[in-house]
Amino acid sequence: MKLQLFAHKKGVGSSRNGRDSESKRLGVKRADGQFVLAGNILVRQRGTKIHPGVNVGKGKDDTLFALIDGYVTFERKGRDKKQVSVYPERKVAQN
């Protein structure tokens, strides 16, 4: 009597997909007109999409942070650049 044995599990190839990098949580962290404390992060970014303005520092990874306690203001810098500043008093819009 001959006994024929078969594999009881099918051989499975591995997929070359199925991995992704963790998100970096970039973007604007404080809104226009919001009160911030010195050291608060205003924007996390790669490159200077938004430039540092008055009372705003820039970290080595281009993170913008408040240098003083005050109110956040997003402004235009020329025609095509944006900047964020922090002022001790709330800025009133001039019409």
Curated annotation (Swiss-Prot):
GO MF term list: structural constituent of ribosome
Domain of life of the native organism: Bacteria
Stretches the record annotates as Disordered: 1-25
Propeptide: 1-6
Cellular component per GO, a single term: cytosolic large ribosomal subunit
Keywords tagged on the record: Ribonucleoprotein, Ribosomal protein
InterPro entries from the UniProt entry: Ribosomal_bL27, Ribosomal_bL27_CS
Family statement: Belongs to the bacterial ribosomal protein bL27 family.
The protein's name in its UniProt record: Large ribosomal subunit protein bL27
UniProt organism field: Thermoanaerobacter pseudethanolicus (strain ATCC 33223 / 39E)
